[in-house]
From Swiss-Prot:
Name of this protein: Regulatory protein CII
Domain of life from the UniProt record: Viruses
Natural source organism: Enterobacteria phage 434 (Bacteriophage 434)
Known DNA-binding region: 26-45
GO biological process: regulation of DNA-templated transcription
Gene behind this protein: CII
Lineage summary: Viruses, Duplodnaviria, Heunggongvirae, Uroviricota, Caudoviricetes
Family: Belongs to the lambda phage CII protein family.
Record key words, sorted: Activator, DNA-binding, Early protein, Transcription, Transcription regulation
Length: 97
């Protein structure tokens, strides 16, 4: 059970890391790290799953505030929530036909 929980946590961490790389872009990530972009592609395949498991075993969670904010924005768009009017109700224009 503990192993399954760690594996699930590792998958969550791996997903968060891959999403962050995707949001930033492979080229910008590689530039920030100081490696070629092909190196980042290899890391995604070989190293990130291993590091994710290590982070899960060490209980080193990845805080993903950006992804949470993005998820809220997407949910808002999908539910078509209208923004509240910036005016008082009496100041709004009414058209009658």
């Amino acid at each position: 059970m503990v192993r399954a929980n760690k594996r699930n946590e590792a998958l969550r961490i791996e997903s968060a890391l891959l999403n962050k790389i995707a949001m930033l872009g492979t080229e910008k990530t590689a530039e920030a790290v100081g490696v070629d972009k092909s190196q980042i592609s290899r890391w995604k395949r070989d190293w990130i799953p291993k590091f994710s498991m290590l982070l899960a075993v060490l209980e080193w969670g990845v805080v993903d505030d950006d992804m949470a904010r993005l998820a809220r924005q997407v949910a808002s768009i999908l539910t078509n929530k209208k923004r509240p009017a910036a005016t008082e109700r009496s100041e709004q224009i009414q058209m009658e036909f």
